[in-house]
Amino acid sequence: MNFFKILSFFSLFVITCFAKLDLNSKTDADGVIQITGRLFHRIVNGKQDFTTVALFSADSSTMNCDVCRLIEPEFKALANSYKLKYGLDSGIRFTYADFGKNKNLFQDFSIESVPNFWIFKPKSIQAIHVDLSHGVTASHLAAIVEKHTGKIADIVYKQDQAKRVGAFLSYIIVGAALFFTRKIIVKIFTSRKVWAALTIITVITLSSGYMFTRIRFSPYSQRGEHGENLWLAGSQQFQFGAEVQVVSLLYTALTMSSIFLAIVAPKVEGAKRQTLFVIIWLAFLWIGYSFLVDIFKRKVSMYPFKLLI
């Protein structure tokens, strides 16, 4: 009789050990079990002697889920941190289910949105739903796991050695490039022409209303009452994105005209050619200002000035 009892206990011990080994073998390097429907029902069956932390998510590239993209590396860091501190026999199992591979499992739990972070306590199939609106960082998730299990682990993020080596090599290449081209770089950054061009571009960009539209999130254009496409807002208090582009183009044309008249015209050889050059760019300048003044008049009906238009 004692022999059969001993044999029964030994058989139970062997089965338990094999069950643990089987579960451990399905754990990846991060300490996460990539589950399918059948495997999850084997893990959470109401008889488990461990806590199951489950993340139900979806591939962010196919589902366009920004939160999924953020939480997945944090969940891996969470599982890896517990694995480093407690090993695989910590009494906590971290499982991950992807929607694309577990549609039936998602239907079984009536999951209609992702991600979902659930905790199943030992001997229970009732999930504890965790609200993710307060954050999805590994530290925040670890605090939740500690609350329900009493175990905590300091979060340790894995260092991607390939990225570190790549970054180091990039720094070396950039440093070498800067060293061998230092004379050219110095000439560029000490050139008056370069700084003049940068200054002109900055002034035109800011004075055309670019920052105004960026701060107010102005639309590019707008439909009028009769379905026409309006690119010019009839008010000084508002501006469309298309209007910024038109005004910037006008400012650029006027600036180039002024530069040609001030710098290039005196260097033109021959009195007749120089006179013709000046007349052409003066006409261009006059026409450009006419369009600019017309825009001012359209935005403010009481604007008193007018040129050609």
Curated annotation (Swiss-Prot):
Stated family: Belongs to the OST3/OST6 family.
UniProt subunit comment: Component of the oligosaccharyltransferase (OST) complex.
Keywords: Disulfide bond, Endoplasmic reticulum, Membrane, Signal, Transmembrane, Transmembrane helix
InterPro entries the UniProt entry points to: OligosaccharylTrfase_OST3/OST6, Thioredoxin-like_sf
Protein name: Dolichyl-diphosphooligosaccharide--protein glycosyltransferase subunit 3
Pathway this chain belongs to: Protein modification; protein glycosylation
Function of the protein: Subunit of the oligosaccharyl transferase (OST) complex that catalyzes the initial transfer of a defined glycan (Glc(3)Man(9)GlcNAc(2) in eukaryotes) from the lipid carrier dolichol-pyrophosphate to an asparagine residue within an Asn-X-Ser/Thr consensus motif in nascent polypeptide chains, the first step in protein N-glycosylation. N-glycosylation occurs cotranslationally and the complex associates with the Sec61 complex at the channel-forming translocon complex that mediates protein translocation across the endoplasmic reticulum (ER). All subunits are required for a maximal enzyme activity.
Signal sequence extent: 1-19
Membrane topology note: Multi-pass membrane protein
Cellular component annotations (GO), alphabetically ordered: endoplasmic reticulum; oligosaccharyltransferase complex
GO biological process: protein N-linked glycosylation via asparagine
Domain Thioredoxin: 29-150
UniProt gene name: ost3
Species the sequence originates in: Schizosaccharomyces pombe (strain 972 / ATCC 24843)
Subcellular location: Endoplasmic reticulum membrane
Source superkingdom: Eukaryota
Spans traversing the lipid bilayer: 165-185, 193-213, 246-266, 276-296
Cysteines paired by S-S bonds: C65-C68
